[in-house]
């Protein structure tokens, strides 16, 4: 990817601060995490949450801090680079194991047939009436075409093995794996992109990522089709920060990996990739 001319002086880095709970569901989650922590540390027993998104993990950390918990917890998603993860609260003398299993799904497609995509697997799993928090990541390794690995809470994993027979129009076989049996997945190769924008406003950055006009980007934002870090973003003028993850319904997800500084024409340089 093309390197752009940059200013000599690096720009001071701004960081997005923690955003407190904004909905009843988020406030309930924080109270639930505090209750788990109280039970775990008052009784010296391990306690585990359901799968949490990145945003929910931030809320969980805040809830633990509010409960005075500084250690004795971790987040586990079943594999190294997991996005969706379970909060494991494990006091020093407790015994426990994260209730995570993995189901390997293998397609029984004819040669040359189109293989299911991530959305096909997720749609089939939702068709089993599973709650999203019972499911972790769905990994489609590039070196294993036609194979997907679904991380799930143990009861959900058992249900998947009993009830899931196809994804989209493709028949599947299922196999329950322990986490020790899950192979190491190759690091996904991300195609990095670089662009310059007039400002670090959401509409300007989104327009660069989507190769559209700022007006079109603003329409997507105002239509409620854009999220930043799993939170709705409805203001085109909102400031963006390094590390932000943008979800645009119908367009994909993007990670703003770096804000290296200014170009010679005094425009902000952004670096990003699409998932």
Where are these regions (language model features)?
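Ferredoxin-like alpha/beta domains used as RNA- or RNAP-binding modules
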Residues: 1-203, 209, 232, 246, ...
């Amino acid at each position: 990817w093309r390197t752009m001319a940059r200013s000599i002086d690096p720009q001071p880095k701004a960081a997005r601060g923690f955003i407190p709970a904004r909905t009843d569901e988020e406030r309930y989650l924080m109270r639930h995490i505090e209750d788990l922590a109280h039970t775990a540390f008052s009784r010296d027993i391990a306690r585990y949450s359901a799968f949490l998104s990145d945003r929910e993990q931030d809320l969980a950390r805040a809830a633990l801090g509010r409960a005075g918990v500084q250690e004795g917890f971790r987040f586990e998603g079943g594999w190294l680079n997991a996005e969706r993860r379970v909060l494991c609260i494990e006091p020093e003398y407790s015994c426990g194991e994260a209730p995570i299993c993995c189901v390997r799904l293998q397609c029984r497609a004819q040669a040359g047939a189109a293989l299911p995509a991530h959305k096909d697997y997720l749609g089939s799993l939702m068709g089993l009436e599973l709650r999203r928090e019972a499911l972790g990541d769905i990994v489609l390794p590039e070196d294993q075409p036609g194979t997907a690995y679904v991380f799930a809470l143990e009861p959900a994993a058992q249900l998947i093995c009993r009830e899931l027979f196809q994804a989209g129009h493709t028949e599947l076989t299922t196999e329950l794996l322990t986490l020790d049996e899950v192979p190491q997945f190759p690091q996904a190769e991300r195609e990095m992109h670089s662009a310059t924008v007039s400002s670090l406003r959401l509409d300007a950055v989104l327009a660069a990522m989507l190769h559209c006009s700022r007006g079109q980007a603003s329409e997507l934002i105002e239509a409620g089709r854009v999220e930043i870090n799993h939170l709705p973003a409805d203001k085109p003028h909102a400031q963006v920060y390094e590390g932000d993850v943008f979800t645009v319904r119908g367009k994909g997800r993007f990670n703003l990996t770096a804000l290296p500084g200014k170009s010679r024409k005094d425009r902000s340089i952004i670096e990003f990739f699409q998932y």
